[in-house]
Amino acid sequence: MQNKIQVKSVEKRENALIFCAENSEIEVKGLSARNHVLVDSDNLSFIYILENESSFIYVSIPHTCWEAMHEAMNNDVVMFVRVNDIEMELEGLKEEVEYLVENIEGNANYGEELVTAVEKVFL
């Protein structure tokens, strides 16, 4: 997927959690938050959607970053993604993930591996 930004690690700062993504050829300036999150069951990731005038850009947040994300959610910490040294707030991420976690809990439609991973971290 060429319109995908892959998060590799997290960085904690006072009152902020930064999802550090690999450098990308995607032009980050001009992107805006879509306030929508999808689930990638195959890759055990949450996918935050950014957009510009012509396309959607998918920020993949893998399960390896979920513990830090859950802690940030519990402490009402603002979450950002950093791509090519530019930081963007992932608006609505907390609410979207909370909604998804409620739907994923015990729901085999998401696949046993994802359900287990989500329940382990978020419940």
Swiss-Prot record:
Belongs to the UPF0738 family. This is UPF0738 protein BCE33L1094. It comes from Bacillus cereus (strain ZK / E33L).
